[in-house]
Amino acid sequence: MPMETTTETKQSGDLIFRSKLPDIYIPKHLPLHSYCFENISEFSSRPCLINGANDQIYTYAEVELTCRKVAVGLNKLGIQQKDTIMILLPNSPEFVFAFMGASYLGAISTMANPLFTPAEVVKQAKASSAKIIITQSCFVGKVKDYASENDVKVICIDSAPEGCLHFSELTQSDEHEIPEVKIQPDDVVALPYSSGTTGLPKGVMLTHKGLVTSVAQQVDGENANLYMHSEDVLMCVLPLFHIYSLNSILLCGLRVGAAILIMQKFDIAPFLELIQKYKVSIGPFVPPIVLAIAKSPIVDSYDLSSVRTVMSGAAPLGKELEDAVRTKFPNAKLGQGYGMTEAGPVLAMCLAFAKEPFDIKSGACGTVVRNAEMKIVDPDTGCSLPRNQPGEICIRGDQIMKGYLNDPEATTRTIDKEGWLHTGDIGFIDEDDELFIVDRLKELIKYKGFQVAPAEIEALLLNHPNISDAAVVPMKDEQAGEVPVAFVVRSNGSAITEDEVKDFISKQVIFYKRVKRVFFVETVPKSPSGKILRKDLRARLAAGVPN
């Protein structure tokens, strides 16, 4: 067993938990790209990106060179320090080149799901003030009008329709022409959108210092919490527009010199084939993928013995599912991490993944990352709680977000005066420093790891002339974890049906935000201040009497 450090301290009455691993030196002064490529001379000729779609392999030297060329290309199109580009792409090498290229300029990348509806994409492009959108030709229709009306350039990674540029125009630049920029540690580099603990999606400002710290907390140090090395092959099937994949797969992989195997979307047979073919050693997944592996009859036909780490995040993984999937990966350590976009995103990581591993319990989602502090507080009083008592999980450290873009009020609600980020998740820390999540204070629905903000769907429902009031809450689902369901009050005399409500929503939102059930009610329960009492509605669902 590795050496442990003191994990519990008292500060001004607060009980504060720290990692069992000692703090490490983190080069927080480095821009993100410099940090990720800091040790490139040790593995410049090794594979960096493997494109699962066509087996094309890019070495570290080729990737770093292409990122610098793209930086110059973006600059020639007018992108300067602190400008924003939107990456509207599925997993692809170009996603990596665009994100890292923007970092070299001190520019910001906002990442959006290419399956968003046109309205959802445009909303994010507007809110983030994106000056360039990098996408595929099949998604151009979603942004075409907005781009032409707002002088936003659209770049396609495949055949470019009229009025769009081709990505090759970026990669043909002279890499030596990168403008000299002085990037400050607190400058924003990534702008993912998250609903936070309540409300509508907001831009989460993640800085160079924040992402460098978060990656270092996972993979740096003598005894790295998430042990990876240059011989590893990481499966990148989770979407890079999601911070879990961007941080714990791409950035961590680049830092250690591992090969990153890019897969556009999850499909069980090709997924298993790629693991076998490229001898994937690290599998960062989400519960729906774990469920598919546990239940698929074809898994036993493939050799998965190369996998040594199976990590699940983005939503809690049940103990039964954890046990079921263990049998499919004979040589793998299986465990969970816990993250939240605003926290950079990793708060806790399973110590079975450490270079010198610790024993862990099934169902735990790790222990707090090093160089950070965690406390559990009573949601009503704000007082910190001792071990084994559930309360709101709070985290403090250099890895957390700078704040929400143009939303100081939401920032103040999430990060308090002492620098603690309040997650809105309820959990407890046991006598072995392991964190268990038990409930969610926040309103967010997690569909297969994707965020659904009830307020967003409720606003759309209230636009319907035959609906006078509505509330959206999560309903448990074996496949998806949670699905959104709506409680709807019909307008006077209206006979609107469940199917009509579902169709009305499905035309306006991406698939995972679609309402799966509609329950018609006389009234939506509310507090005296008018806040929807979601707990009451969730209790009705649990009791099997929604109406």
From Swiss-Prot:
<dbReference type="GO" id="GO:0009698">
    <property type="term" value="P:phenylpropanoid metabolic process"/>
</dbReference>
<dbReference type="Pfam" id="PF13193">
    <property type="entry name" value="AMP-binding_C"/>
</dbReference>
<feature type="binding site">
    <location>
        <position position="449"/>
    </location>
    <ligand>
        <name>CoA</name>
    </ligand>
</feature>
<feature type="region of interest" description="SBD2">
    <location>
        <begin position="337"/>
        <end position="404"/>
    </location>
</feature>
<keyword id="KW-0547">Nucleotide-binding</keyword>
<protein>
    <recommendedName>
        <fullName>4-coumarate--CoA ligase 1</fullName>
        <ecNumber>6.2.1.12</ecNumber>
    </recommendedName>
</protein>
<dbReference type="InterPro" id="IPR042099">
    <property type="entry name" value="ANL_N_sf"/>
</dbReference>
<dbReference type="Pfam" id="PF00501">
    <property type="entry name" value="AMP-binding"/>
</dbReference>
<feature type="binding site">
    <location>
        <position position="194"/>
    </location>
    <ligand>
        <name>ATP</name>
    </ligand>
</feature>
<feature type="binding site">
    <location>
        <position position="341"/>
    </location>
    <ligand>
        <name>(E)-4-coumaroyl-AMP</name>
    </ligand>
</feature>
<feature type="binding site">
    <location>
        <position position="248"/>
    </location>
    <ligand>
        <name>(E)-4-coumaroyl-AMP</name>
    </ligand>
</feature>
<dbReference type="InterPro" id="IPR045851">
    <property type="entry name" value="AMP-bd_C_sf"/>
</dbReference>
<dbReference type="GO" id="GO:0005524">
    <property type="term" value="F:ATP binding"/>
</dbReference>
<keyword id="KW-0587">Phenylpropanoid metabolism</keyword>
<feature type="binding site">
    <location>
        <position position="349"/>
    </location>
    <ligand>
        <name>(E)-4-coumaroyl-AMP</name>
    </ligand>
</feature>
<feature type="binding site">
    <location>
        <position position="336"/>
    </location>
    <ligand>
        <name>(E)-4-coumaroyl-AMP</name>
    </ligand>
</feature>
<comment type="similarity">
    <text>Belongs to the ATP-dependent AMP-binding enzyme family.</text>
</comment>
<feature type="binding site">
    <location>
        <position position="196"/>
    </location>
    <ligand>
        <name>ATP</name>
    </ligand>
</feature>
<dbReference type="InterPro" id="IPR020845">
    <property type="entry name" value="AMP-binding_CS"/>
</dbReference>
<dbReference type="GO" id="GO:0016207">
    <property type="term" value="F:4-coumarate-CoA ligase activity"/>
</dbReference>
<feature type="binding site">
    <location>
        <position position="314"/>
    </location>
    <ligand>
        <name>(E)-4-coumaroyl-AMP</name>
    </ligand>
</feature>
<feature type="binding site">
    <location>
        <position position="198"/>
    </location>
    <ligand>
        <name>ATP</name>
    </ligand>
</feature>
<feature type="binding site">
    <location>
        <position position="244"/>
    </location>
    <ligand>
        <name>(E)-4-coumaroyl-AMP</name>
    </ligand>
</feature>
<keyword id="KW-0460">Magnesium</keyword>
<feature type="binding site">
    <location>
        <position position="336"/>
    </location>
    <ligand>
        <name>ATP</name>
    </ligand>
</feature>
<feature type="binding site">
    <location>
        <position position="442"/>
    </location>
    <ligand>
        <name>(E)-4-coumaroyl-AMP</name>
    </ligand>
</feature>
<keyword id="KW-0436">Ligase</keyword>
<feature type="binding site">
    <location>
        <position position="265"/>
    </location>
    <ligand>
        <name>CoA</name>
    </ligand>
</feature>
<feature type="binding site">
    <location>
        <position position="531"/>
    </location>
    <ligand>
        <name>ATP</name>
    </ligand>
</feature>
<feature type="binding site">
    <location>
        <position position="440"/>
    </location>
    <ligand>
        <name>ATP</name>
    </ligand>
</feature>
<feature type="binding site">
    <location>
        <position position="425"/>
    </location>
    <ligand>
        <name>ATP</name>
    </ligand>
</feature>
<feature type="binding site">
    <location>
        <position position="341"/>
    </location>
    <ligand>
        <name>ATP</name>
    </ligand>
</feature>
<dbReference type="InterPro" id="IPR000873">
    <property type="entry name" value="AMP-dep_synth/lig_dom"/>
</dbReference>
<feature type="binding site">
    <location>
        <position position="337"/>
    </location>
    <ligand>
        <name>(E)-4-coumaroyl-AMP</name>
    </ligand>
</feature>
<comment type="function">
    <text>Carboxylate--CoA ligase that may use 4-coumarate as substrate. Follows a two-step reaction mechanism, wherein the carboxylate substrate first undergoes adenylation by ATP, followed by a thioesterification in the presence of CoA to yield the final CoA thioester.</text>
</comment>
<feature type="binding site">
    <location>
        <position position="448"/>
    </location>
    <ligand>
        <name>CoA</name>
    </ligand>
</feature>
<feature type="binding site">
    <location>
        <position position="197"/>
    </location>
    <ligand>
        <name>ATP</name>
    </ligand>
</feature>
<feature type="binding site">
    <location>
        <position position="202"/>
    </location>
    <ligand>
        <name>ATP</name>
    </ligand>
</feature>
<feature type="binding site">
    <location>
        <position position="195"/>
    </location>
    <ligand>
        <name>ATP</name>
    </ligand>
</feature>
<feature type="binding site">
    <location>
        <position position="337"/>
    </location>
    <ligand>
        <name>ATP</name>
    </ligand>
</feature>
<keyword id="KW-0067">ATP-binding</keyword>
<comment type="pathway">
    <text>Phytoalexin biosynthesis; 3,4',5-trihydroxystilbene biosynthesis; 3,4',5-trihydroxystilbene from trans-4-coumarate: step 1/2.</text>
</comment>
